[in-house]
Amino acid sequence: MKRLVLGAAASLVLASAALAEEMRLAVTTSFHNSGLAEVLLPEIKKDLDLDVQLLVVGTGQAIRLGEAGDVDAILVHSKKAEEAFLAGGHGTRRREIMYNDFVFIGPEGDAAGIAGAEDAAEALQQIADAGAAFVSRGDDSGTHKKELSLWASAGLDAEAFGPWYRAVGAGMGAALNTASGMDAYIMSDRASWLNFGNKGGLALLFAGDPVLFNQYAYIPVNPEMHGHVKHGLAMQLEEWLVSDKAAALINGYQINGEALFVFNAKR
């Protein structure tokens, strides 16, 4: 019997062929902090033989990574910024995947009384009137953009606030930790709050205003702008993210019996 002896180069080729394909996906810190990635990524690997490398940043930075061609796709939650990204030719299309909502967290004693507010604008007005400590992410993330728009809708200018308003320039988890340490108010996405372990004396005080709706969307980077991006893999991932299996995993992801996201992709 003849034995096949492989040279070093051939061995490397075979070894590379056995490895899963890889792509880079920029995701928000709120998505990462929710823990959902730990559920989805192993199933993506199993079904597609695809390793998805996450770059965890705020929405603003994720969009800049996409504009630079440093990632193959983005998963973010700021529709206005996403539409500008598409209008600039940086993405091929926007596909809504899932949603949750933003919530206002604060000290259990609720000195500003926001638990009884009629809407988000009133809750923020009461925090401002009380001069109660408030932590802002201050990082150009989707959550930060939404927070600023809510202050503006309430007729308030965050840039003019006093020392009670603290912009920390950090992700959702770090900002929640700061709020916990300061016993301060903060706006969070519901998923990050539910998965947050250092709640201390904080509690969910206000939710339910329709303006707090929080949509996540997936956008592949345009290969006509950046020929090196792995557009084929990005499209494979998109089709998986809108599949029945992804829907079941997303809708079934719960903490203490409470769902963190609702799948709403149109197929």
List each model region and its residues.
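Positively charged n-region of N-terminal signal peptides that target proteins for export
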Residues: 1-4
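Exported/periplasmic ABC-transporter solute-binding proteins
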Residues: 21-51, 55, 60, 64-70, ...
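Acidic, polar ligand-binding/catalytic clefts
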Residues: 73-99
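Serine endopeptidase catalytic core focused on the charge-relay Asp
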Residues: 104
